[in-house]
């Protein structure tokens, strides 16, 4: 019953020590001098580096969608002698997952900046990478960002396809985590509110609200778990389908199967 759920249950919350949220928060942030920026090919052309003031940093801009562990090996090998203090991940979940994993292995401080709003990777202790062609999740408290900066500016240049892909991911994470056996009152509160914010933003095309929904979702599922929908989706992701595209099908199937 609810009483025993709230009173006889011990749970722990973990998240990055510092989260900065708000319009133009990235543009106003003063980044450390010695940084490695990890991102994808389009970062420069989309103006992300100009806006963030990161053009003069060391830049690796070759992160692929659904990235492989070989990409992290290449980065670690290429930059292991460099004297930077921070690794900055700027982009979608792929860029941030690579950046977090590299910083974890290289023992560098981590600053994560999402430019899509769905993965929640900026606030989780998870890095998802392909190993031998199959997606694998790495979990460790040392994978957490030291600073997450969430700025709705980046929604402006997002295509409808990227927005849909990201929002489906966030909604799937929220509904799966709400029903997770690892859920607790705090994560349920976050996931329910995240879903409502995301749904409202899509129905009313108020996309500037998506970053808040995504952030709350990341904190919610990051302290519980995704479930069957995400597990099933990796079968499609391994065949090259986008993460959101796969989840649009598998999460519904999972909820029907679980009657949740």
Where do the protein language model's features map onto the residues?
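Alpha-helix C-terminal capping segments
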Residues: 100-109, 221-224, 238-240, 256
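Active-site nucleophile and cofactor-binding loops and adjacent substrate-binding regions
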Residues: 64, 90-92, 240-244
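Glycine/threonine-rich beta-strand-loop-alpha-helix active-site module
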Residues: 69-153
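Histidine-centered catalytic micro-motifs
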Residues: 226-244
């Amino acid at each position: 019953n609810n009483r025993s759920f709230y009173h006889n249950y011990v749970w722990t919350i973990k998240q990055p020590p510092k989260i900065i949220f708000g319009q133009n928060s990235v543009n106003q942030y003063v980044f450390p001098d010695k940084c490695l920026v990890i991102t994808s090919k389009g970062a420069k052309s989309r103006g992300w580096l100009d806006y963030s003031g990161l053009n003069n940093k060391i830049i690796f801009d070759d992160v692929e969608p659904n990235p492989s562990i070989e990409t992290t090996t290449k980065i670690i090998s290429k930059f292991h002698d460099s004297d930077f203090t921070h690794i900055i991940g700027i982009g979608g979940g792929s860029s941030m997952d690579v950046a977090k994993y590299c910083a974890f292995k290289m023992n560098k401080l981590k600053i994560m900046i999402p430019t899509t709003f769905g993965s929640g990777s900026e606030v989780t202790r998870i890095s998802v990478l392909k190993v031998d062609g199959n997606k694998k999740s790495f979990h460790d408290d040392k994978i957490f960002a030291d600073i997450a900066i969430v700025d709705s500016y980046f929604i402006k240049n997002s295509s409808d396809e990227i927005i849909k892909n990201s929002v489906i991911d966030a909604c799937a994470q929220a509904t799966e985590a709400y029903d997770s056996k690892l859920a607790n009152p705090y994560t349920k509160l976050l996931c329910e509110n995240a879903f409502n914010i995301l749904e409202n933003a899509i129905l009313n095309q108020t996309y500037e609200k998506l970053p808040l929904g995504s952030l709350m979702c990341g904190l919610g599922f990051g302290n519980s778990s995704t479930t069957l929908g995400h597990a099933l989706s990796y079968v499609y992701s391994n065949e090259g389908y986008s993460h959101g595209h796969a989840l649009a099908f598998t999460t519904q199937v999972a909820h029907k199967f679980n009657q949740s």
